[in-house]
């Protein structure tokens, strides 16, 4: 059984999570994966570990984790891989990215999830400057 886990960034406002949930519902409607669930990087639940545990408990033998992020960054390159137990980078200096705005990040626990024997975990890239994204940006620019 295959599960798709979409990872959203999360926000103090509901919009971010709601959009990712809507994307998940639309993917579910296409009947490609046995299970489609959402996990949030920060601020909201379910967390990534909660969601991965849920899909494994439901019988998933392959878990495809796909960030619903436009660009690679600290979350997609470090935080999410750490949670998935697949981070291979150097962690010296810890959390050393800086924002030019004042707010405190509320990251969920980044303890790696337990992946049982016999379960395959696959981690995918964020969307990037895909031509389909370009079309959406141009539609928005044209008021569509």
UniProtKB/Swiss-Prot annotation:
UniProt binding sites for Ni(2+): 9, 75
Q: Which reaction does it catalyse?
A: Co-sirohydrochlorin + 2 H(+) = sirohydrochlorin + Co(2+); Ni-sirohydrochlorin + 2 H(+) = sirohydrochlorin + Ni(2+)
Q: Which residues form a coiled coil?
A: none
- How the protein assembles, per its UniProt entry? Homotetramer; dimer of dimers.
Q: What is this protein called?
A: Sirohydrochlorin cobaltochelatase
The GO annotation for biological process reads: anaerobic cobalamin biosynthetic process; methanogenesis
Record: active site: 9 (proton acceptor)
Name any one Pfam family assigned in the record: CbiX
Q: Which gene encodes it?
A: cbiX
Q: Which residues bind substrate?
A: 45, 70-75
Record's compositionally biased regions (Basic residues): 95-108
Region of interest: Disordered: 89-112
The protein's role, per its UniProt record: Catalyzes the insertion of Co(2+) into sirohydrochlorin as part of the anaerobic pathway to cobalamin biosynthesis. Involved in the biosynthesis of the unique nickel-containing tetrapyrrole coenzyme F430, the prosthetic group of methyl-coenzyme M reductase (MCR), which plays a key role in methanogenesis and anaerobic methane oxidation. Catalyzes the insertion of Ni(2+) into sirohydrochlorin to yield Ni-sirohydrochlorin.
InterPro entries, per the entry: CbiX-like, SiroHydchlorin_Cochelatase, Sirohydro_Cobaltochel/CbiX
Q: What PANTHER family does the database record attribute to this sequence?
A: SIROHYDROCHLORIN FERROCHELATASE, CHLOROPLASTIC
Keyword annotations from UniProtKB, A to Z: Cobalamin biosynthesis, Cobalt, Lyase, Metal-binding, Methanogenesis, Nickel
């Amino acid at each position: 059984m295959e599960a798709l886990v979409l990872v959203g960034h999360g926000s103090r406002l509901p919009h971010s999570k709601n959009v990712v949930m809507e994307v998940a519902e639309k993917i579910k409607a296409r009947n490609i994966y046995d299970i489609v669930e959402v996990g949030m990087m920060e601020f909201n639940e379910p967390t990534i570990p909660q969601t991965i545990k849920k899909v494994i408990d439901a019988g998933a033998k392959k878990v495809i984790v796909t960030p619903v992020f436009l660009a690679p960054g600290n979350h997609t390159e470090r935080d999410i891989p750490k949670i998935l137990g697949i981070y291979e980078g150097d962690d010296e200096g810890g959390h050393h990215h800086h924002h030019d705005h004042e707010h405190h990040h509320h990251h969920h626990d980044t303890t790696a999830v337990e992946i049982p024997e016999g379960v395959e975990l696959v981690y995918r890239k964020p969307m990037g400057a895909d031509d389909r994204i370009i079309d959406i940006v141009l539609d928005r620019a044209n008021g569509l």
